[in-house]
């Protein structure tokens, strides 16, 4: 605080000014002392009522204030509704009831009335009469135009009628009452069309004999950060990591393991995989072909192991066994050589059997071989005239002509590459009888050694 004082100037002198500084007094606010809480057992009725009112006030719905107090509705506990069963009395019972109300009922008539109405006139002797909120049903049969249907919820109406027939919640109904568990249908994932069945291969392990060590990671619900594999659609076989979810459209945003691209896939075609499987298979480009080849080699190995060795003691049986085993070995080796040998030729009509090529668009279709440059470089033409390149021979199989007289080509043996006309077909023995076009010789061959042809230029075979 600054104070300014001035003195009257004397004649012929300058005025004097002086300043004084005073320290402001600070008023410190003292914190109140901590209140000491003493726990006292409240056993009086007044204290209990006060506590109950406080608890009710906490649950009270605030509507408005009046005179500084809260005015609102207290939610009363709802009781189960009961609709008493309407009983129609005949004229004899009605006469006894009227006498009972008038007070002129004799002891004999009172006994009759007790036999007719074991629960009393108004059901006052019924055990369940005091439980639940009763809805009185009038005996009159007047119009129900002014019926108040809001008196009871529609979902509670049927249960209220059953309670009026002495039914208790949880009891079974019928001659042999038993409790039946409520079966709730599974919620269909959004985006799944009507009639479609969702695929759920999650958690199904093909190798059921694996140890618990291999099952260290349990597959849970797909969430952000989970590893998934696409099992259907154009991105079939793609592995990725979930970066986001769109529950409204039941879709996932994933980042692919190969290429690191971000794509949106439906959750219906995605299954969760373990981190071990993701590290092992996510970088494999041709996983499906690798699995097929692995299964084929495993089948051949088991087939060879199942053949018992010859253990006969006699020399003749040894010779016979050795000859038969050698013939089997020669047959198997010849079949392997024939299957491994190039049999595909131009103008052959073959069937496409690979399911993964172009999402199965050519699967089980008949195609024509246009050019053959190698067992992994075959050019084909489909029924629409589209040409496909770099087709493997293992993706094709031979086709047998349907009608007698159609042309075919021998694709195995010493007559490989020769045209013939089919004369007969034996489906039981899987053989065809054909006449060679060049020499008119009649030959017999197995189904797998011949194939139908679709020749564009006849002069190439003259």
UniProtKB/Swiss-Prot annotation:
**Which key words are in the record?**
Nucleus, Repeat
List each copy of the G-patch domain by range: 154-202
Please classify the protein's predominant subcellular localization into one broad category: nucleus
Composition bias (Basic and acidic residues) maps to 289-305, 318-337
Domain KOW, which positions?
221-248, 401-428
Residue numbers spanned by region Disordered: 1-26, 182-218, 289-337
Against SMART domains, the record matches this protein to: G_patch, KOW
Q: Name one GO biological process term.
A: mRNA splicing, via spliceosome
> Per the record, GO CC terms?
spliceosomal complex
Matching entries from Pfam families are given as: G-patch_2, GPKOW_C
Q: Which GO terms describe its molecular function?
A: nucleic acid binding
- Compartmental location: Nucleus
Q: Which PROSITE patterns match?
A: G_PATCH
Here the segments flagged for biased composition (Low complexity) are 306-317
Please report which protein family the annotation says this sequence is part of. Belongs to the MOS2 family.
This chain's protein is named G-patch domain and KOW motifs-containing protein homolog 1
Q: Which gene does this sequence derive from? A: gkow-1
């Amino acid at each position: 605080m600054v104070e300014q004082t001035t003195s009257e100037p004397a004649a012929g002198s300058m005025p004097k000014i002086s300043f004084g500084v005073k320290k402001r007094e600070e008023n410190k606010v003292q914190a109140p002392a901590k209140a000491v809480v003493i726990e006292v057992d409240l056993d009086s009725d007044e204290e209990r009522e006060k506590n109950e009112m406080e608890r009710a006030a906490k649950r009270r719905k605030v509507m408005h204030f009046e005179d500084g107090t809260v005015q609102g509705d207290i939610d009363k506990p709802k009781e189960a509704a009961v609709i008493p069963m309407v009983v129609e009395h005949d004229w004899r019972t009605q006469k006894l009831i009227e006498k009972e109300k008038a007070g002129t009922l004799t002891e004999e008539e009172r006994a009759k009335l007790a036999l007719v109405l074991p629960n009393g006139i108004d059901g006052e002797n019924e055990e369940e009469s005091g439980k639940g909120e009763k809805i009185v049903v009038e005996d009159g049969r007047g119009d129900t135009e002014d019926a108040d249907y809001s008196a009871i919820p529609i979902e509670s109406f049927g249960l209220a009628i059953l309670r009026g027939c002495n039914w208790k919640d949880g009891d079974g109904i019928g001659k042999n009452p038993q409790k039946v568990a409520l079966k709730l249908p599974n919620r269909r994932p959004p985006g799944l069309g009507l009639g479609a069945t969702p695929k759920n291969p999650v958690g199904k392990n093909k190798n059921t004999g694996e140890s618990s060590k291999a099952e260290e990671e349990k597959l849970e619900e797909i969430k952000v950060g989970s590893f998934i594999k696409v099992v259907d659609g154009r991105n079939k076989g793609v592995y990725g990591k979930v970066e986001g979810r769109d529950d409204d459209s039941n879709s996932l945003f994933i980042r692919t393991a190969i290429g690191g691209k971000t794509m949106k896939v439906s959750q219906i075609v995605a299954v969760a995989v373990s981190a071990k499987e993701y590290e092992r298979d996510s970088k494999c480009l041709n996983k499906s072909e690798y699995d097929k080849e692995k299964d084929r080699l495993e089948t051949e190995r088991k087939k060879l192991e199942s053949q018992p060795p010859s253990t006969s003691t006699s020399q003749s049986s040894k010779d016979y066994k050795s000859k038969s085993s050698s013939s089997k070995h020669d047959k198997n080796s010849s079949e392997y050589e024939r299957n491994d040998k190039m049999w595909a030729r131009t103008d052959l009509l073959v069937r496409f059997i690979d399911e993964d090529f172009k999402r199965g668009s050519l699967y089980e279709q008949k195609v024509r071989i246009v050019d053959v440059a190698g067992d992994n470089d075959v050019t084909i033409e489909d029924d629409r005239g589209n040409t496909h390149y770099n087709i493997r021979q293992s993706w094709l199989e031979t086709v047998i002509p349907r009608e007698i007289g159609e042309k075919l080509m021998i694709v195995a043996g010493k007559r490989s590459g020769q045209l013939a006309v089919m004369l007969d077909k034996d489906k039981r023995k899987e053989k065809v009888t054909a006449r060679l076009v060049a020499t008119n010789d009649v030959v017999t061959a197995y189904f797998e050694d011949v194939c139908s042809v679709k020749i564009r230029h006849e002069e190439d075979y003259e």
